[in-house]
Amino acid sequence: MAILKASEIRELSAEEMKGKIAELKRELMKEGVNKSTGGAPSNPGKISEIKRTIARILTIMNEKEAQAKNA
């Protein structure tokens, strides 16, 4: 999965964001298993990239929830 920019994430619906998070978590787990079994990572920065993307999605979801409560 490619890196999602904040502007791209903001265009997604809440359900699409949840789906992306689930997909990224599966990919993160797969990369973690590969790392723990001693396999060489295909891209060394991929794990941190996935974690950052998950955090970015969660942050935007929380921003949208806060805006909905204040509106």
UniProtKB/Swiss-Prot annotation:
<dbReference type="GO" id="GO:0006412">
    <property type="term" value="P:translation"/>
</dbReference>
<comment type="similarity">
    <text>Belongs to the universal ribosomal protein uL29 family.</text>
</comment>
<keyword id="KW-0687">Ribonucleoprotein</keyword>
<dbReference type="GO" id="GO:0003735">
    <property type="term" value="F:structural constituent of ribosome"/>
</dbReference>
<dbReference type="InterPro" id="IPR001854">
    <property type="entry name" value="Ribosomal_uL29"/>
</dbReference>
<dbReference type="InterPro" id="IPR018254">
    <property type="entry name" value="Ribosomal_uL29_CS"/>
</dbReference>
<dbReference type="InterPro" id="IPR050063">
    <property type="entry name" value="Ribosomal_protein_uL29"/>
</dbReference>
<protein>
    <recommendedName>
        <fullName>Large ribosomal subunit protein uL29</fullName>
    </recommendedName>
</protein>
<dbReference type="InterPro" id="IPR036049">
    <property type="entry name" value="Ribosomal_uL29_sf"/>
</dbReference>
<dbReference type="GO" id="GO:0022625">
    <property type="term" value="C:cytosolic large ribosomal subunit"/>
</dbReference>
<keyword id="KW-0689">Ribosomal protein</keyword>
<dbReference type="Pfam" id="PF00831">
    <property type="entry name" value="Ribosomal_L29"/>
</dbReference>
